Amino acid sequence: MFETVEHGVREQNDVFFSSPLDPIHEFPHTEGVDELTKLSREGYLFLKANEIDRAEAEFKKMLELDENNNYALVGLGDAARKRNKCKEAADYYSECLRYHPGNNYALFGLADCYKNMNLYAKAIEIWEQYLEHDNANITVFTRVADAYRKIHDFQNSKRLYLKVLEIEQDNPYALIGLGHLHYDFKKYREALFYWQKILEQNSENVDIRILTSIGNCYRKMKQFDRGVYYFEKALEKDPNNFYGLFGLADCYRGMKQQQHSIKYWEAILKKDPNNKVILTRMGDAYRHIGDYEKAEKIYQQALDIDYDSYAILGLAILCKIQGKYDEAITSLTHLMQADRRNYRIYLELADCYIHTNEKAKAIEVLQAFQQYGIKNQAISEVLSTLQN
């Protein structure tokens, strides 16, 4: 739901709402109703019971009696959506709107399909049409705000989330959305404000994703000790939660307590043994605690899976630490050509040249990085020291 972990490990899924619209409430429950109404009511009852095949059969019978029946077309769209066949569902909803423009159920379903197909601009367009008929629907306002967030439209997204809070103070979906929105734009303090409101509402049974999201805010703000508390709380709920394990390991890494991070990297690798990012992080941890043999083995394990620049960097740093400067320089020079904007490579290469008393080459390497127009304090400080 909340973030893409470093180097694109994986992303949590957003909370999706179930549809608040239910056509079954519109059908009369009196005796003597006509055949279409009876079929429609039975179809939607089957749909609610998740008997999708039987529901579809009822809706198709309706189309035999009335080929453009709005309830049948929407019902078939809903059935397809339940099967996660969004394209098929969208076709049914669109067909309904051809003959019944402004049909709320078709508009809602179509917009939801577009959202699930990541066609957010189209989803927004349809939801805006829906709001012309129902301009106080909190769920739709929240979904439109979510869609604006997905296309990185901060102002419109925030405006609609806040509109929901005007209608319903402390609406959890709006608060969660505002947390995501500010987090996406690196406004971590603001994101923290909204997610903590959710925590205050239900501190005992809060969703684990809120705990990891709050932890991630503190992690991003480099308040690692505060992040540890929330990641530990998350792991109390689920000891194998990826985001709790990753966050806790990364916080200990940030606090320079690599010896504590290792067991959490290992816990992730038990579930995902071929995760190169985690392998390189664990290799770094062993390197920092001085277990160079173990670190080298783990970096190589990552490279056996596939090329990984961080594993190569780790091996080069090991060479430098062990005084194998020529080997480190060769490796870092090749790596620099493949990843020209990674400042760490330039710093490590310059440090190798400093150790081999080649000050001019160290300066040349650092100046080469600055030619890309990227400001980096560490590069500037080392360069200034060398030039003075």
Where are each of the predicted segments found?
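TPR alpha-solenoid repeat register
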Residues: 38, 72, 106, 140, ...
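Register position in tetratricopeptide repeats
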Residues: 48, 82-83, 116, 150, ...
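Residue-level recognition of tetratricopeptide repeat
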Residues: 35, 69, 103, 137, ...
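Structural marker of alpha-solenoid helical repeat scaffolds
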Residues: 65, 99, 133-134, 167, ...
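Canonical tetratricopeptide repeat
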Residues: 41, 75, 109, 143, ...
